[in-house]
């Protein structure tokens, strides 16, 4: 008889650092994790294309209240491009639009050339993206052969460095701001080289302060679900650790009470601006707040349970 999972009927709270495999959508991976944990509520913190793999933080239960903050986080990718070929989608899943000869490239010159892409820049989102235009996803319009004008967005490439250059394939690692489309970056690089390019492999290795070292694959997760259910719970990061790099404000019980009631409070020696984690002395993390113009802390996301 199959062992009943201890999560059944319980509220599960925490974040899983999933290593999403190639060939599955981010939502598909999310639904499988949600089923394994039998979670009532789940959400991811920034989608990866089916062609891409790597870090996909998945929030369960109360952790979903904080998922939007990781959407805003910087991200790191390992990218492999094929030079000389332009596709409809900017990656290997698309149809070939153009082919061009690739001139012999010097590694040192290409490394220097790539560094020129660092810094703030305007980027036009690709048609094959989930951005909406008049209520419709752009990729749905693209599949109908419809192209619409898209507004450029400012993104920042913090660092970009060459990792490989062989047989018309160019690899690089990029650390960038939210909203950066790697397919568009690859196309821009190919265009600047005069030969075109598209992404053939993409791996995300960092989201905010979370790196690849603590990821677990979907295959390993499903195996644990059958053989070691207790270990599943241990894989979840507590809700209070999701924004651990934020400044914390320690609060006495009275001030914590008022914040839980939705009231702003004044706390001595609190930061002068920005977001803060709310910590009640003796009880721990219970949400996040923001410093108002008059120096008070206003509650923004309150957490009512951290484990299930």
Curated annotation (Swiss-Prot):
MF terms in GO: RNA binding; tRNA pseudouridine(55) synthase activity
Active site residues per record: 49 (nucleophile)
Pfam families: TruB-C_2 (PF09157), TruB_C_2 (PF16198), TruB_N (PF01509)
InterPro entries: PsdUridine_synth_cat_dom_sf, PsdUridine_synth_N, PUA-like_sf, PUA_sf, tRNA_psdUridine_synth_TruB, tRNA_sdUridine_synth_fam1_C, TruB_C
Domain of life according to the entry: Bacteria
Enzyme Commission number(s) of this protein: 5.4.99.25
Catalytic activity: uridine(55) in tRNA = pseudouridine(55) in tRNA
Keywords: Isomerase, tRNA processing
Family named by the database record: Belongs to the pseudouridine synthase TruB family. Type 1 subfamily.
Function: Responsible for synthesis of pseudouridine from uracil-55 in the psi GC loop of transfer RNAs.
Descriptive protein name: tRNA pseudouridine synthase B
Gene name of this polypeptide: truB
């Amino acid at each position: 008889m199959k062992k009943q999972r201890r999560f059944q009927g319980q509220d599960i709270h925490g974040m899983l650092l999933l290593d999403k495999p190639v060939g599955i959508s981010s939502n598909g991976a999310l639904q499988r994790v949600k089923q394994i944990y039998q979670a009532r509520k789940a959400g991811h913190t920034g989608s990866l294309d089916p062609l891409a793999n790597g870090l996909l933080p998945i929030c369960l239960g109360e952790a979903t209240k904080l998922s939007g903050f990781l959407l805003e986080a910087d991200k790191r990718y390992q990218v492999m491009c094929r030079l000389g070929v332009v596709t409809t989608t900017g990656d290997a899943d698309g149809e070939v639009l153009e082919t061009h000869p690739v001139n012999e490239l010097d590694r040192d010159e290409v490394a220097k050339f790539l560094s020129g892409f660092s810094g703030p820049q305007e980027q036009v989102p690709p048609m094959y993206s989930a951005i909406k235009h008049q209520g419709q996803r752009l990729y749905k319009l693209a599949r109908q052969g419809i192209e619409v004008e898209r507004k450029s967005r400012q993104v920042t490439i913090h660092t970009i460095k060459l990792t490989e250059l062989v047989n018309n394939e160019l690899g690089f690692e990029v650390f960038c701001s939210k909203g950066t489309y790697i397919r568009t970056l690859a196309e821009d690089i190919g265009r600047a080289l005069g030969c075109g390019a598209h992404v053939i492999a993409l791996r995300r290795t960092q989201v905010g302060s979370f790196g690849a070292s603590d990821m677990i694959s979907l295959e390993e997760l499903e195996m644990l679900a059958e053989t070691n259910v207790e270990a599943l719970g241990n894989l979840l990061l507590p809700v209070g650790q999701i924004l651990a790099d934020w400044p914390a404000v320690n609060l006495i019980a009275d001030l914590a009470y008022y914040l839980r009631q939705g009231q702003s409070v004044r706390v001595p020696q609190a930061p002068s601006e920005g977001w803060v984690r709310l910590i009640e002395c003796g009880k721990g993390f219970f949400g996040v707040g923001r410093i108002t113009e008059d120096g008070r802390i206003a509650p923004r996301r309150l957490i009512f349970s951290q484990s299930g």
